[in-house]
Amino acid sequence: LAAGSDPNQADQEGTTIQYLKPDTSSYFTSSAYEKEMTRELTKYKGRETIQITTENYMEVMELIYLYPNDFVGKKVTYTGFVYNDPQTKGYQFIFRFGIIHCIADSGVYGLATRGSDQTFKDNTWVKVTGTITVDYYQNLKQSLPILNLTEVKEVGQPDNPYVYRVF
């Protein structure tokens, strides 16, 4: 997904390229991070439907990747732009540009989606609704939370396409 990125260069420069999952763990001790994520998870645990907004986008995405089984079966709605992975047919990623602390840790964050017979060109903004499952994603050789789409609607780009991690 991060075409042209060189992990060795990133290590030398002290930067990382982030995509899919926001990761704020480097800003906490491990016990403080676990405590903070557990506290945040309680806000969503009892809900069957989760509206992901500009304000909670990074928080919810980080929680979905940390605790995917707690989100399986939940209905999720959010807005983002389309990225078509050229190596995997049937999946589209829906991303937002996100900033955790500063521009050096910015990236694209979101979920792989499937289930819509509609296809959209890269960078098309859409509002999606679907149900979370966890499946093995061959391209990344790992299990990922996947949004099985029930609704997709093309929308305009938000005034500010960026989302921010707020504590």
Task: Please report, for each region that a protein language model flagged, where it lies by residue.
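OB-fold and OB-like single-stranded nucleic-acid-recognition modules
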Residues: 1-167
